[in-house]
């Protein structure tokens, strides 16, 4: 049964023809670029278990009624687009590019990438805006320290950030605006706030007056008396209230500046996001996201200035991800305890890092450890190896696609489908969605490698159908590689690097062990196996000889087994 699958790419719409049981590689390369709502509908038509459908921007199947935790209401709410049938507007606060991005950034943008993918999986059209704060005190300070132009520095680190996001398979947002390109919009919004008497000018600076905005504190739950000044600098004594924050900063020597009605200067920290979100999504839109450290003061201040500029400004869902912790302390550049994305992916496949991040619910804190990265990497290898073995056997053997699948296969597919959508629709419980793949993967391994499994009726058809459904799940989670074979080789290369060993040396050790076994020197054979296992290289004996694969280093594997 052939089907035309149309996949959206930056260059346009590229039609790809795929067969259900053959020539899959072009299809899953395409699916790695975008969550496949059309593919899911195709699958729904082919097999009854895929019967969930959505129309007019609203899901009809109960498992597909997305519920998201809204920071403002402090509860989960059913997601309803502001305007049914129109695209969903989503704004996520981006990075301040003055240094390499760390895995705290990865946590945030992987989380919102999953939300973006899942909304599209549910057939919503999404306009996703994520900004670059390329004008900021930290950028200026770092540029002065390095003797570099601030815009050159921010461009360099912005490009590095985009490379990091591509490595983590985060889909590009619809728009990625920079503050420096939107100063006119920022100035116009400040004028509106001044006209509405919610701001005041002091010596070329413009401050927002929190006393003139009674709703201040609704998002964070803070009382105004408890709030510290909402800036990244010391309190200015010229403020009417210590919590007043800068909308416009007067120019200082050696800093970039723009002309304005209040004199030369540059935007404050918070106004940029209000102006850019309004420019691209309107004053009212559906979702605003960021790390939980942005709830106050940044997002609290955004709400205040947006409403002061336009009283009808409304954002329906405020969504925030939890921190990445190191030794129970938030990972951040300011604390000096951060690990960069680039440093991690020197030793681990980028999708192992993504798997690690998805293993914890996005709102919960996640503790960064090498041991957990190793577990994620091992889990990823097992998943891709199973799917690669399945792909290989289905490509080289013919299957009869005309007959229905066995009932037990349909049950496994239906169960995965239901568990995946139920967990994802419940505030994006990615850890549960990942766990839902465990049983189908085990079934696939039985069909591939056990004598009983190989004799099962419609074995190839079952393998192919299971692989197709797991591929859809991986795509929505952003874990589908362009090639299983390439990903497996990359995982092997990273394992060798972590073990500080070459593949040639591993092969040599395998040959030494084979010779020892032939000579009945079993103690030496065991020593070689344990020596490699200690550094994360597992030896696999089979009828065709001994091969190796990455694994948890032996002490860590023993610890994991002890826990289970």
Swiss-Prot record:
One Pfam family from the record: CysS_C
Transit peptide feature range: 1-43
Identification of the protein by name: Cysteine--tRNA ligase CPS1, chloroplastic/mitochondrial
Reaction(s) catalysed (UniProt annotation): tRNA(Cys) + L-cysteine + ATP = L-cysteinyl-tRNA(Cys) + AMP + diphosphate
Gene: CPS1
Biological role: Nuclear genome-encoded factor required for normal assembly of chloroplast polysomes.
Source organism, top-level taxon: Eukaryota
Binding of Zn(2+), residues: 93, 273, 298, 302
Presence of keyword Electron transport: no
Family as reported in the entry's similarity comment: Belongs to the class-I aminoacyl-tRNA synthetase family.
Chain positions of motif 'KMSKS' region: 330-334
Segments carrying motif 'HIGH' region: 95-105
One MF term in the entry's GO annotations: ATP binding
InterPro entries: Cys-tRNA-ligase, Cys-tRNA-synt_Ia_DALR, Cys-tRNA/MSH_ligase, CysS_C, Rossmann-like_a/b/a_fold, tRNA-synt_1_cat_dom, tRNAsynth_Ia_anticodon-bd
SUPFAM superfamilies found in the cross-reference section: Anticodon-binding domain of a subclass of class I aminoacyl-tRNA synthetases (SSF47323), Nucleotidylyl transferase (SSF52374)
GO BP field: cysteinyl-tRNA aminoacylation; regulation of translation
Enzyme class label: ligase
Chain positions recorded as ATP binding sites: 333
GO CC terms, sorted: chloroplast; cytoplasm; mitochondrion
Keywords, comma-separated and alphabetical: Aminoacyl-tRNA synthetase, ATP-binding, Chloroplast, Ligase, Metal-binding, Mitochondrion, Nucleotide-binding, Plastid, Protein biosynthesis, Transit peptide, Zinc
EC number: 6.1.1.16
Transmembrane parts of this sequence: none
Gene disruption phenotype: Pale green leaf phenotype. Global defects in chloroplast translation.
SMART domains hit by this protein: DALR_2
Keyword presence, Chloroplast: yes
